[in-house]
Amino acid sequence: MIITISGPPGSGTSTLARGLSEVLGVRWVNSGDLFRRIAAERGLSLKELGRLAEQGPEIDYLIDDAQRSLAKSGSGIFEGRLAGHMLDADLKIMLKTSLSVRASRIAKRENKSIEEALSEARAREECEARRYKMYYNIDINDLSIYDLIIDTGRWDERGTLSIALAAIRALK
């Protein structure tokens, strides 16, 4: 079974992906980890690779190809902003919540001010929206491709995991 989890920074995608991977006993493929691996292979910092990704689609395409290749080799939880668009999944999950909640989570996780996290999240989301539209003609704000959309501001980690597991069990 292939499950994709997408959502903006701070929405809880990694938390849900980790939880599903543990409960279901399947691997978790994180596009952020793929990005970090590419940076390490090229001897670049994450910031440097991010700037490079803004100059052309090559980096995004490498990540897409890696996810597709891993999906062909079996079941898993595939986490990433475009995972739902790139993979033929059995279940496509989108996590969302308000920017203020996400900024608060990011600030706590990365030990920075809420204002800084808010500013960085806005800038990142605007950059990603432009890139995805330009490179793929994807409107990242169009949620119509997702089977399940969960507002993680309404449920805690356990509640979000329970909702996702109920959807997965209903598929079988």
From Swiss-Prot:
UniProtKB keywords: ATP-binding, Cytoplasm, Kinase, Nucleotide-binding, Transferase
Top EC category: transferase
GO terms assigned for molecular function: ATP binding; CMP kinase activity; dCMP kinase activity
Family according to the record: Belongs to the cytidylate kinase family. Type 2 subfamily.
Biological process per Gene Ontology, one example term: pyrimidine nucleotide metabolic process
Amino acids binding ATP: G7, P8, P9, G10, S11, G12, T13, S14, T15
Gene name of the record: cmk
Name of the molecule in the record: Cytidylate kinase
UniProt cross-references to CDD domains, sorted A to Z: CMPK
One Pfam family matching this protein: Cytidylate_kin2
Subcellular location: Cytoplasm
GO cellular component: cytoplasm
Taxonomy, superkingdom: Archaea
Residue runs in coiled coils: none
Record field: catalytic activity: CMP + ATP = CDP + ADP; dCMP + ATP = dCDP + ADP
EC annotation from Swiss-Prot or TrEMBL: 2.7.4.25
